[in-house]
């Protein structure tokens, strides 16, 4: 049987980079990782509460965290930062202050920057949010997957694979459905592949969405 490996972890150091950049003593390492996870969850929850979008897409592609002794630098890569800024003009300052209080980082300054990504629908996280929104609104899964593929084609990607697993369309028995368009060379390390695994709660239960996007050549 083929062993499935995370495509991002498989390519670290070649075409993919780390999203957390810092050094720590081995005994403090787990604390640092947990802190990163809490920061990411806090930011996602804040954006979810304060962003009013019709599609239900928050548009966070990834959150990079760089730590120094006296500074925590957080870079939020977003597809639609304008919506967040329009709905909360002072949102970034507010988020920065709240995070500083939450993590009690008195000795360390906390700085948040937002970077817009050029082609939002070429990112698997944003695409997974889009599909999740469609499934919550009871759109047929095939229609949602086809629409997602149309959106990625506009973003000039070389290939995409979308997989949805669970009680699809409320059927009694859980199953896995997938669709592929273009090339997705998972075995080639030089091929830059972006990947995302996303969980969505629908009225029928939990569905898992996985997306692989082949961005650029081998």
Curated annotation (Swiss-Prot):
PROSITE patterns: KH_TYPE_2 (PS50823), RIBOSOMAL_S3 (PS00548). It comes from the Eukaryota. Part of the 30S ribosomal subunit. It holds the Pfam family Ribosomal_S3_C. Its main location: plastid. One of its GO terms (biological process) is translation. One of its GO terms (molecular function) is rRNA binding. This is Small ribosomal subunit protein uS3c.
